[in-house]
C-alpha cells in the first residue's frame, strides 16, 4: 500500500474510497461534520494530542476538544466550510500542549459531498 503524503490534493477522494486508510496515515486525521462534531479521529492524531481516539467521537471539536483553536484563523477557515461545504486550505498553527508550544501544519480539506471536512495535522 502506498503512503499518502501530507498535503496530497486528492486525499479526500482516496479516503472516501478507502476510509480504513485514515488509520495508517503518518499524520493526524480528524473528520468533522459541518457542525464541528468529530466523526473520525485516527491514532496518529491521538498521539499528537495525547487523547484516546475512542473518547472523542461525536464530541464538538472546537468547544470540547480543542477550544484553543476557537476564534483563530484555523477556526475561521472551518466556519467557511460550515457555510459553503467547501475547504482546501493549508496553514501553520501553534497550540499549547502540557505547557509547551507545539507547531503544526494544518490541512483542511472537504469531502466531495460537502458534508464532512478532513482536518489533517502534521508536526512542523
Curated annotation (Swiss-Prot):
Any idea what this protein is called?
Photoactive yellow protein
Listed Pfam families: PAS
* Molecular functions per Gene Ontology: photoreceptor activity
Which residue range or ranges hold the PAS domain?
22-85
Gene encoding the protein? pyp
The species this protein belongs to is Rhodobacter capsulatus (strain ATCC BAA-309 / NBRC 16581 / SB1003)
Q: Which family does it belong to?
A: Belongs to the photoactive yellow protein family.
Alphabetized UniProt keyword annotations: Chromophore, Photoreceptor protein, Receptor, Sensory transduction
Q: Name one GO biological process term.
A: regulation of DNA-templated transcription
Amino acid at each position: 500500500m502506498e503512503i499518502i503524503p501530507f498535503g496530497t490534493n486528492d486525499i479526500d477522494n482516496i479516503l472516501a474510497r478507502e476510509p480504513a486508510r485514515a488509520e495508517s496515515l503518518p499524520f493526524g486525521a480528524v473528520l468533522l461534520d459541518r457542525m464541528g462534531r468529530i466523526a473520525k479521529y485516527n491514532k496518529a492524531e491521538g498521539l499528537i494530542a495525547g487523547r484516546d481516539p475512542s473518547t472523542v467521537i461525536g464530541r464538538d471539536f472546537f468547544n470540547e476538544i480543542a477550544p484553543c483553536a476557537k476564534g483563530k484563523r484555523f477556526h475561521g477557515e472551518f466556519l467557511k466550510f460550515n457555510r459553503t461545504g467547501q475547504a482546501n486550505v493549508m496553514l501553520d498553527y501553534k497550540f499549547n500542549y502540557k505547557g509547551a508550544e507545539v507547531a503544526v501544519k494544518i490541512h483542511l480539506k472537504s469531502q466531495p459531498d460537502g458534508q464532512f471536512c478532513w482536518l489533517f495535522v502534521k508536526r512542523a
